[in-house]
Amino acid sequence: MQAAVASKTNISLKGSTEIVTEFFSYSINTILFQRGLYPPESFTRVAKYGLPILVTNDQSLKDYLDNVLKQLSEWLLSGDVQKLVLVITDIVTKEVLERWVFDVTTDIPKEGEAPRQKPEKEIMNEIQAIIRQITASVTFLPLLPNACTFDLLVYTSKDLAVPQKWEESDPKFITNSQQVKLRSFTTTIHKVESMVAYKISND
């Protein structure tokens, strides 16, 4: 009788960083598309995590995201990222309407420690579940006004120097908000827990 064996993948700090950075890239694109912050025609469909995912083909947005993710990747590698937050704001009223929060816990392997192991398929399935939840969020999130913008906030270790072109920010919390916890995933080195907070209408 044959036994099916789930192949384990050795997880390095560099490999884990690449997985998490890529997840953030696809998550941000999915949120921007699902919440209608950019025209649907400015997105291209790709296959990732066993799902169809829409990614931007707007060059200025791609450049912005590439710059943020490059810096984020460096901070993930050094264990300095605490959370990534995507904030959606009403352009007219400047009111914060949504906060997509990705909390990051890092457990960097110690020198001489045996390689961490986890099946790659298991990690991909965990990520797939989060992307599915982001896509399904339109069923419960309030409609956004026509003119909205977004910011990306990265919470880091306090003693970390802020690079040029980056600036300190307030947390951009939402007054009168509802929170929905989403799923999490772990590479065994980085754990990402996600949630969305949205403004409750006063109507």
Curated annotation (Swiss-Prot):
<dbReference type="GO" id="GO:0099139">
    <property type="term" value="P:cheating during chimeric sorocarp development"/>
</dbReference>
<keyword id="KW-0498">Mitosis</keyword>
<protein>
    <recommendedName>
        <fullName>Mitotic spindle assembly checkpoint protein MAD2A</fullName>
    </recommendedName>
</protein>
<keyword id="KW-0158">Chromosome</keyword>
<keyword id="KW-0137">Centromere</keyword>
<comment type="function">
    <text>Component of the spindle-assembly checkpoint that prevents the onset of anaphase until all chromosomes are properly aligned at the metaphase plate. Required for the execution of the mitotic checkpoint which monitors the process of kinetochore-spindle attachment and inhibits the activity of the anaphase promoting complex until all chromosomes are aligned at the metaphase plate.</text>
</comment>
<dbReference type="InterPro" id="IPR003511">
    <property type="entry name" value="HORMA_dom"/>
</dbReference>
<dbReference type="GO" id="GO:0007094">
    <property type="term" value="P:mitotic spindle assembly checkpoint signaling"/>
</dbReference>
<dbReference type="GO" id="GO:0005737">
    <property type="term" value="C:cytoplasm"/>
</dbReference>
<comment type="subunit">
    <text>Interacts with cdc20.</text>
</comment>
<dbReference type="InterPro" id="IPR036570">
    <property type="entry name" value="HORMA_dom_sf"/>
</dbReference>
<keyword id="KW-0995">Kinetochore</keyword>
<keyword id="KW-0539">Nucleus</keyword>
<dbReference type="Pfam" id="PF02301">
    <property type="entry name" value="HORMA"/>
</dbReference>
<dbReference type="InterPro" id="IPR045091">
    <property type="entry name" value="Mad2-like"/>
</dbReference>
<keyword id="KW-0131">Cell cycle</keyword>
<keyword id="KW-0132">Cell division</keyword>
<feature type="region of interest" description="Required for assuming the closed conformation and for interaction with cdc20">
    <location>
        <begin position="194"/>
        <end position="203"/>
    </location>
</feature>
<dbReference type="GO" id="GO:0005654">
    <property type="term" value="C:nucleoplasm"/>
</dbReference>
<feature type="domain" description="HORMA">
    <location>
        <begin position="14"/>
        <end position="196"/>
    </location>
</feature>
<comment type="similarity">
    <text>Belongs to the MAD2 family.</text>
</comment>
<keyword id="KW-0963">Cytoplasm</keyword>
<dbReference type="GO" id="GO:0000776">
    <property type="term" value="C:kinetochore"/>
</dbReference>
<dbReference type="GO" id="GO:0051301">
    <property type="term" value="P:cell division"/>
</dbReference>
